[in-house]
């Protein structure tokens, strides 16, 4: 079986690692007739294309800057920041294998049998966050009657911005993608006309208190998808350094993906391979990796200059 981990100790660049991994994975998939590995190759190829041919991202980021200018004009009293990134190779690989494991497990639990290749392929066609932008807002204390008003006021402004964003970006050449009822908003602050497009993690609280608004757009000029996340500073703190941060998220995902006991080993090749790849990634010791422009003292102290673990920064605005 071809595994990403085996390519992370050669001193190569991320692009070289991707190229070699895709080449070997495709060769093995053709040899074994593994259709899911072929989908896996095409998924990885999207990341490779983004890293190699990213001129369009300059124009895309400029269009996001136009919304930044709009917000600066409409909300001159508010502090806010925009961030953009291409999903990191390790996060993307974790997500792909995690989707395979979770879908097969949940399907088996519900139906007592394994999903068909067609059903699994359909589940693996929904990766639309390889490019993502995040808008974070905060109302300075001097513009609040009291600190107790902060959460209510910032949430009100966040939904106001969410109401405007789809129409604004459509004028810039983007099309909002329906959320298909996933995390459908129940907030009276969100207009009915835009509710079908948002996944509202504010109304539907999770166990780790993660809160955010997510919306997916199709960029008609570059013909690719991108995700936009909207948060208040308080929500972003919870996501980045609080109970919903990536460490807590990874532990939760490890639990979800580690449900090996329900699927007998050897019965479902696609589950077995995705499970093994996922667990090997979760157990990576980053300090031992040898990747060009990447270094880590441990799994918390990381200097990622290549996008291997934390992704490639596209755009950051001043606050």
Question: Language-model features: where?
Answer:
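Nucleic-acid processing machinery
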Residues: 1-317
